[in-house]
Amino acid sequence: MKTRTSKLAAIFTSVALAATMLASCGGSSDKITVISREDGSGTRGAFIELTGIEEKDSNGNKTDNTKKDALICKSTDVVLTQVSGDKNAIGYISFGSLNDTVKALKVEGVEPSTATIESGDYKIVRPFNIAVKDGLSDAAQDFENYILSSEGQDIIEKAGYIKIDKSAAAYALNNASGKVVVSGSSSVTPVMEKLAEAYQKANTNVTVDVQQSDSSTGIKDAINGTSDIGMASRDISDDELSQGIKSVTIAQDAIAVIVNKDNAVDDITMDEIKAIYTGSKTTWSDESK
């Protein structure tokens, strides 16, 4: 009996040692955890287009080649939480939502920053748009005017995004009153909440209700009248525009590629991003620089 027990102990010890050696050589512990946003997310739509993960066939039909087993997160905050808690994770978020719980990678040697976004050196950049119909209520039109005013653009810049009009006129208070409903992108929501807070102090006769969902839902809400203003962190498509809305760009934002703070990788190429997200590269072993 003792002999059998000794043999079993030796086997378990060997298995444990083999697992440890495998991990140290880039085995299962080195496998990349790929984190993506959900379908309908403007951040996902812009990211897959700009990095080549989305491809078109000869007829112009688009295919999203994000790997099927990617972990899907339905908001920026959830992506941050997942990446900060997994040393092998990779994800992508709005540059303006970056915090010190994760590490933003350089892309092609360029760090995401206000300067590199404005210069065009950082390549993964997209607009923040709002979707509105003609004939907005006085209150909704006044809020839009505030967003595009010098006061609104300054709030956008202070929040870490790129203002689209450096010479915007000052906000002119009028007699607008009522309620404005704004819905859509979780990436746009944080800065929209700051804009709404400041606007309601400037015009105390208007209340602004900001509802977070995703870009596609926000655009649909604006089309069907569920909301006055839809938020989108991507370009609004021709098909969407044909349904009675117009697109107004309120800011520019980059998409930051993020990893865990303990990850040794600091820089990544566009080709490597595509390879990771389409599944042709599955470990970090040959990525460390």
Label the predicted regions.
Residues K2-F12:
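Bacterial N-terminal signal peptides that target proteins for export
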Residues K2-R4, A19, V182:
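Intrinsically disordered/low-complexity terminal segments and short unstructured peptides
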Residues F12-A19:
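Alpha-helical transmembrane segments
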Residues T20-S24:
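C-terminal motif of bacterial Sec signal peptides marking the signal peptidase cleavage site
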Residues C25-K289:
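Exported/periplasmic ABC-transporter solute-binding proteins
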